[in-house]
């Protein structure tokens, strides 16, 4: 016989008479599953999507830490919390947190370069510098600026520094042509030993005092380090440590 004792949430039967909870009541008590706002797809060595990571409708932490919503525990190039992707609403927003190895976005159209911007071409990490913004060294004794080395050649408007181990400058390339080409086989700045760099990979151009970076249809793409919060579009490609991820906006 069914009594009128209310059944507490989470219980399947009445503790007094043993009557089971009705299906309609059970359905009303069931928590709603977390809404999937989109996903990140890991790109494998063949360029195919492999693992798919759902994005919750809110903030999603990415990094090496186990408390991240999307964790890559074995990637030593990532910080505990490397960046945060907000999928609360469209467009999605990405906020970088790591100050060492950085978060990169693959460029699909020409982008303007600014002093200090970091570029990834293949395995190469390159820092762009404007000549007029380079600071001369300062004497530790007098505090005055020092002029080190030879005077800068006429017509030079920029410099690209190749960053090596320990974040030290391995090579420096002066930019004086309006278009400076980067590649493995053809161009002004070559990386012949980097198999991830295309024969002709990218170009840095100076136009009217402004500088632009353009990918030349390379196989593996050209990436620019994200310095501040940005918006993301569907199919954008992110590079975090050793992980290449494609953004999918909206539930599958």
Predicted segments with their positions:
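Intrinsically disordered, low-complexity acidic Ser/Thr-rich regulatory segments
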Residues: 1-74, 86-88, 112-188, 252
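A short, polar/proline- and glycine-enriched secondary-structure boundary/capping micro-motif
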Residues: 103-107, 131-133, 138-140, 222-226, ...
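Short coil/turn segments at secondary-structure boundaries
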Residues: 194, 251-252
